[in-house]
From Swiss-Prot:
NCBIfam families noted in UniProt: PRK04323.1
Protein name, as recorded: Putative regulatory protein THEYE_A0405
Family as reported in the entry's similarity comment: Belongs to the RemA family.
InterPro entries the record matches: RemA-like
Entry-linked HAMAP family: RemA
Length: 85
């Protein structure tokens, strides 16, 4: 299943390990390190980064959507998969 992370950008749900807030120092360091390694994907379309998605391939994806918004989308996908809708 795929999750829309904003502006038409999608990520495979099975590859997501975590969705975190970008404000803490460790997350800023993680973002900088990913940039140096060539593992940073900026999907913000020039807007403020509101969440960081960490994948199992060690990629860091920046999104302009709030963590809560992405979580709602993931939960909706899970409900559809479970047949609750």
């Amino acid at each position: 299943m795929l999750v829309n992370i904003g502006f038409g950008n999608i990520v495979s749900l099975s590859r997501i390990i975590a969705v975190v807030n970008p404000g803490s120092s460790p997350m800023k360091r993680m973002k900088d390190e990913a940039r140096k390694r060539g593992k940073l994907i900026d999907a913000t379309e020039g807007r403020k980064t509101r969440s960081i998605i960490i994948t199992d391939s060690d990629h860091i994806i920046l999104s302009a959507l709030q963590v809560e918004t992405i979580l709602q989308r993931i939960n909706e996908i899970n409900r559809v998969e479970d047949g609750d809708l």
